[in-house]
């Protein structure tokens, strides 16, 4: 195995028999279980060890002694049951094999494993990756990821700036805007405001002001008939420009006329109304009485403490 292959982490097991296939269950339960236990110590103690090649031979061949330093395959003697071969890469005799464990396995299951042929081999091929320092490598990866999203990188003072990034202090990523673009944007906003303001004035001035702010009492089935727009939508000449913002600001000043005897709701009064009226007046037109609870709620949220007051109250019905 070449040295550059030692940086992977792959493991493979292969069983080969000249007398036919070996049972997969037996391989998993016996062979792999034993070999995994045997090799676990070597994997933990010596990372980067070369693959091992185990060959189980027929017992009529000569037994050989262990040759740790030899260049050829090294043989481990397992009594009279079989010969156990191991390829180069073994570090010491203690890491080669646990003789008693593997010998018991082979003795108990020799007939089932069909080890009567000339040769059967088990290849336990593994490659280990030298474990790198986890904290440093992970930290380096995180630093690279953060640096890739920052406009100017982390700069020379990487540690301090990285800590600031993790604390949310260096995430003020701004987009560069040319001066000409900024001036053009400001002119566009100002032009839009001017246009909107002009439209507002024209629209408002075209709305006629009523001559009288009082309700006209033309009794239709006991309900009020509003031929003009609701007086609450209008103010005096000086304050009319603020009226749309506080369209209903003087509702709390208005006193509706004395209510008529209760009758059935008359929704046709809204059909005959040519101009829009406020919600309170709609209720008053339909039901013939002011919405006391609605006015109370409105005064609580938008009453004297929240909205400007009228100086003249000539619109109050007396």
From Swiss-Prot:
Disulfide bonds: none annotated. InterPro entries: IBD2. Coiled coil: none annotated. It is found in: Cytoplasm, Cytoskeleton, Spindle pole. One of its GO terms (cellular component) is cytoplasm. GO terms for biological process: cell division; mitotic spindle assembly checkpoint signaling. Keywords: Cell cycle, Cell division, Cytoplasm, Cytoskeleton, Mitosis. Belongs to the IBD2 family. Part of a checkpoint which monitors spindle integrity and prevents premature exit from mitosis. This is Protein IBD2.
